[in-house]
Amino acid sequence: MSKAQFLREYKLVVVGGGGVGKSALTIQFIQSHFVDEYDPTIEDSYRKQCIIDEEVALLDVLDTAGQEEYGAMREQYMRTGEGFLLVYSITSRSSFEEVSTFHQQILRVKDKDYFPVVVVANKCDLEYERQVQPHEGRDLAKRFNAQCIETSAKQRVNVDEAFIAVVRAIRRYQKESGPPQAVNAPAKSQMSAVGGRAAEKDDHVDKGCCRGCVVL
């Protein structure tokens, strides 16, 4: 029986400071368009179905508040998340420094020494405003035993790759710690491939876009 006939659900949480582009990344991934102006997010949830590495994935994506006044909500979604995108803006040193705080909170809530995360350096289209160098993001991700991916929600650079990387990290983690959650698979015609052979390695990140997933 093909791997594509099994549907696994993954609870992804997008975390980061205010104004780093968490909602723009999420909406670009889910709906394939860029939202430039919107009210600060409190909490939005999206669902999207993909095939990643020949396995069906139902992604339940939670876009969270970055503002400090909503900090009390964080532990609640950190308890339920299976993988996290830790987002900062390359144009904001302070947002980069916040990433470690978010990561420490995740490990504390999960009571783990390691948990699946991907560090996402957003707004790479604003190179002329860069405050955080690429090697700094990579070095931080190494501390978390994670991958760092530079993205642009505006230009759709590495947006899909960032979400795919989190799913792959979750799968590796689940193989070590126990079986993943599964739900009934839909008809084959509803599925679209994401992350095929060209993206099999986690460190293969470029401007290619993987589209065509089903939004639920």
Curated annotation (Swiss-Prot):
Q: Which InterPro entries match?
A: P-loop_NTPase (IPR027417), Small_GTP-bd (IPR005225), Small_GTPase (IPR001806), Small_GTPase_Ras-type (IPR020849)
Q: Which residues form the propeptide?
A: 214-216
Q: How does it sit in the membrane?
A: Lipid-anchor
EC class name:
hydrolase
According to the UniProt record, list the residues that bear Cysteine methyl ester.
213
Which PANTHER family does the entry link to? RAS, DI-RAS, AND RHEB FAMILY MEMBERS OF SMALL GTPASE SUPERFAMILY (PTHR24070)
Q: Name one GO molecular function term.
A: G protein activity
Q: Which family does this protein fall into? A: Belongs to the small GTPase superfamily. Ras family.
Domain of life of the organism in this record? Answer: Eukaryota
Report the activity regulation comment: Alternates between an inactive form bound to GDP and an active form bound to GTP. Activated by a guanine nucleotide-exchange factor (GEF) and inactivated by a GTPase-activating protein (GAP).
UniProt keyword terms in alphabetical order: Cell membrane, GTP-binding, Hydrolase, Lipoprotein, Membrane, Methylation, Nucleotide-binding, Palmitate, Prenylation
Subcellular location(s) of the protein: Cell membrane
Name the major location.
membrane
**According to its UniProt record, which reaction does this protein catalyse?**
GTP + H2O = GDP + phosphate + H(+)
- The yes or no answer to whether the keyword Lipoprotein is present is yes
Lipidated positions (S-geranylgeranyl cysteine) are: 213
- The protein in question is named Ras-like protein
GO cellular component terms, A-Z: plasma membrane
The residue numbers the entry assigns to motif Effector region are 38-46
Binding site residues for GTP: 16-23, 63-67, 122-125
GO-annotated biological processes? signal transduction
Please state the Enzyme Commission number of this protein: 3.6.5.2
- Residues anchoring lipid (S-palmitoyl cysteine): 209-210
Please name the SMART domains in this protein's record: RAB, RAN, RAS, RHO
